[in-house]
Design a protein with these regions (language model features):
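A bilobed periplasmic-binding-protein/Venus flytrap-type ligand-binding module shared by bacterial periplasmic
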Residues: 118-127, 241-256
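Sec/Tat signal peptide C-region and signal peptidase I cleavage site
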Residues: 18-22
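Short beta-strand->loop
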Residues: 29-31, 103-114, 123-125, 135, 143-169, 183-187, 221-238, 246-250, ...
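Ligand-binding pocket segment of bilobal, Venus flytrap-like solute-binding proteins
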Residues: 169-235
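Hydrophobic residues within well-ordered alpha-helices
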Residues: 73-74, 200-205, 244
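N-terminal segment of the mature folded domain
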Residues: 23-151
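Bacterial N-terminal signal peptides that target proteins for export
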Residues: 1-10
Length: 257
């Protein structure tokens, strides 16, 4: 099953769990590079929903850095559903906002994780800097584009992938920390989210390599001039597991639970 089909099945179960919807509008607060996924998803879900005899619903989307999005929900953004980049961001909705139960991750199948992804490198045509693996990212003169891990879930996956590579290769946390510090010294700009970093790299032509979600890298290639970019798969990356949750406190108040 493709990532998109699996995401569709899992999030649909979140949206239709419990009593029938009492409102005609839902808000999905999501992380940065999922806009295109959920445009397709929303259309497919609505067709499925209407085929079961229900009235069509409107599904609104909000996108941004995962950590920033979690903060917005805690501060009052009325999300019915959150689909964020890391479980830790959704945990904050319980810890700081009491918007979801502590055991939210047990409420849906597969630990509320409908799909997985990974982190890859996106380089320019011909790979002029010869970037093949993580070690190439810390070389002098190589500009690395990655978002700010303080606001972006994808950036934290990037950080963890680099750390895991260095720790395995060099054998200690101290060496891993040193490696990651060297990598970030090669980052000229820290955008707040993954899509912002893609725009910096693709549209603004800044940097030699973009650390990207796999789907974001493929999208950049599909929407750019043929052959303008290439994907490089590093020798070691990370299994990213973006989870979903119903924001039960908000959905209950709005009658969408």
């Amino acid at each position: 099953m493709s990532i998109r089909r699996f995401a569709l099945a899992a999030l649909a179960s979140a949206l239709i769990a419990g009593p029938a919807l009492a409102a005609d509008t839902l808000l999905n607060v999501s992380y940065d590079p999922t806009r295109e996924l959920y445009v397709e998803f929303n259309d497919a879900f609505n067709k499925h929903w209407q085929a079961q005899g229900h009235e069509p619903i409107k599904i609104q989307q909000s996108h941004g850095g995962s950590g920033k999005q979690a903060r917005a929900v805690i501060d009052g953004l009325r999300a019915d559903v959150v689909t964020l980049a890391l479980a830790g961001d959704i945990d904050e909705l319980h810890r700081l906002g009491k918007l979801i139960p502590e055991d939210w991750q047990t409420r849906l199948p597969d630990a509320s994780t409908p799909y997985t992804s990974t982190i890859v490198f996106l380089v320019r045509k011909g790979n002029p800097k010869g970037i093949k693996d993580w070690d190439d990212l810390v070389k002098p003169g190589v500009e690395v584009i990655t978002p700010n891990p303080k606001t972006s879930g994808g950036a934290r996956w990037n950080f963890l992938a680099a750390w895991a590579y260095a720790q395995q290769k060099y054998g200690s946390e101290a060496k891993a920390q040193e490696f990651v510090q060297k990598l970030y010294k090669n980052v000229p700009v820290l955008d707040t989210g993954a899509r912002g970093s893609t725009i910096t790299f693709v549209n603004n032509q800044i940097g030699d390599v973009l650390l990207a979600w796999e789907n974001e890298a493929h999208l950049a290639i599909a929407e750019s001039d043929r052959g303008a970019f290439e994907i490089v798969a590093p020798s070691r990356s990370i299994l990213a597991e973006p989870p979903v949750a119903v924001v039960e406190r908000v959905a209950s108040r709005r009658g969408t639970l």
